[in-house]
Amino acid sequence: MKAPVRALICQGIEALRSNGTLPTNTLPPDFVVERPKTRKHGDFATNVAMLLSKATGSNPRLLAQTLVAALPTSADIARIEIAGPGFINFHLHPVAYQRETINVLKQDNDYGRNLSGQSRTVGVEYVSANPTGPLHVGHGRAAAIGDCLARLLEANGWNVKREFYYNDAGVQIENLVRSVQARARGLKPGDALWPTDAYNGEYIADIAKAYLAGDSINMVDTIITSTKNVDDTAAIHHFAVNYLRNEQNHDLAAFNVDFDIYFLESSLYKDGKVEETVQKLINSGHTYEEGGALWLKSTHFGDDKDRVMRKSDGSYTYFVPDIAYHLSKWQRGYERAITELGADHHGSLARVHAGLQALEIGIPPGWPEYVLHQMVTVMRGGEEVKLSKRSGGYVTLRDLIEETSTDATRWFLIARKPDSQLTFDIDLARQKSNDNPVFYVQYAYARVCSLMHQAHEKNLNYDQTSGMASLDQLSDNTSLCLMIEISRYPEIVQIACELLEPHLIAQYLRELAHAFHTWYHNTPVLVENAVERNAKLTLACATRQVLANGLNLLGVGTPEKM
């Protein structure tokens, strides 16, 4: 709905350039076309006249009047007003919203999608949990946000590659192996010989039990079988890491999250990519040695201080494999890369960007893009839930799914802006009431399904063609408000993608559901008059389609009965 208004404005500017009112070198400024907060100021408003006045030295209000007079006529525009210092407010004719409602049903599942990404490749990395324990609620938020971002990017025409980076190397993995080995030897937390920095959750005992039993793990490309040898740390390492990878994959599948690529940090060392990346940085001239360590001149690229890459003992600091990993993304042809991380990783971003810039191979500044999410607080009965017996110290994603549902968990973890702290209220997520936002939205969808079922049961045949042709019969304000709300969906899909803020989809769906429930309570639908009934059912079906499309972007289901 916004694009035709913008196109009219551009045509008006061109007309003023052609007749000499505006200089021929006047380019259309980067003006805003937006929906005002209240409809009394129109359906759309623009600041274009004020921007043009700055470039030309004209009075903005007079220029607005001149521009309005130069606009082509449009059947969609009911009237145009000039407000304040030079805002131009457009009031649309209801026929524009009626036509958009018809477009919903014609485009079906494709409604709201666009081709702005031009099939370019974007890699979206998310979750990327260490395989040292069950996925916690923070990983769940990362999974929900990352998966929704991937869906949004696809809806905006991008070729998306979903990627999970396993940090299967380093000190935490060594602690995991020692923990499982100790359990396999009969030790338990609190024993004198229990390892320092060991993992204490019950899942460690489960891994040790499976290892001692000689169990096998079915991975995607191989079957891993325990050797049962408690002294073979390499075998325990291989078994424990893959056991937890398998457990994490199970939880992600239950959460309707999948990936195209699983990338192992260990492969960067195995394939020599870490050494190769370090050598490239040395060759670029952006490193130096001091105190027996190798340093990156990261201050040359915006970091607040230079960073140690290779310590005096020959080991690498943790951000070096991160540079090698992101270099691999660039080499795989990702024109755009988005990495979703917890906010606690904020300190590493500048050094990774610095390392990639120091390679001097054409990687643009700001590549990759980062989306950071804040912590999640889980509440039950008005009190914070802090512990899980299985994990030994945190609430797991599996806990939330089992206590609520996949749909509720996904919704609640997406519902706030990623960089905002989030409270997950288990009691609210389980409610079947309008206070529960996911229930409220799904209930709107189910209500339309119920309407269609009732019409069938009463032998009230629905003629969609007649309904599309008769939408002008719905002249009441609640029907128009619902059509207006429906028409916002494509804009929201585009804006949410541009800002990388999937919570905007959830917010919009609540507003659409509210508009529908209001319409439903104020408008008898299954009336005797067939023409009116078909028009109302058409509006209901268009609402259902947009709800379905939006819920699909969130990875949330569309139940036909509630």
Swiss-Prot record:
CDD domains: ArgRS_core (cd00671). It is found in: Cytoplasm. SUPFAM superfamilies: Anticodon-binding domain of a subclass of class I aminoacyl-tRNA synthetases, Arginyl-tRNA synthetase (ArgRS), N-terminal 'additional' domain, Nucleotidylyl transferase. GO terms for biological process: arginyl-tRNA aminoacylation. Keywords: Aminoacyl-tRNA synthetase, ATP-binding, Cytoplasm, Ligase, Nucleotide-binding, Protein biosynthesis. It catalyses: tRNA(Arg) + L-arginine + ATP = L-arginyl-tRNA(Arg) + AMP + diphosphate. It is an enzyme of class 6 (ligase). SMART domains: Arg_tRNA_synt_N (SM01016), DALR_1 (SM00836). It comes from the Bacteria. Its EC number is 6.1.1.19. A motif ('HIGH' region) lies at residues 129-139. GO terms for molecular function: arginine-tRNA ligase activity; ATP binding. It holds the Pfam family Arg_tRNA_synt_N. One of its GO terms (cellular component) is cytoplasm. InterPro entries: aa-tRNA-synth_I_CS (IPR001412), Arg-tRNA-ligase (IPR001278), Arg-tRNA-synth_N (IPR005148), Arg-tRNA-synth_N_sf (IPR036695), ArgRS_core (IPR035684), DALR_anticod-bd (IPR008909), Rossmann-like_a/b/a_fold (IPR014729), tRNAsynth_Ia_anticodon-bd (IPR009080). Belongs to the class-I aminoacyl-tRNA synthetase family. Monomer. This is Arginine--tRNA ligase. The lineage of its organism: Bacteria, Pseudomonadati, Pseudomonadota, Gammaproteobacteria, Lysobacterales.
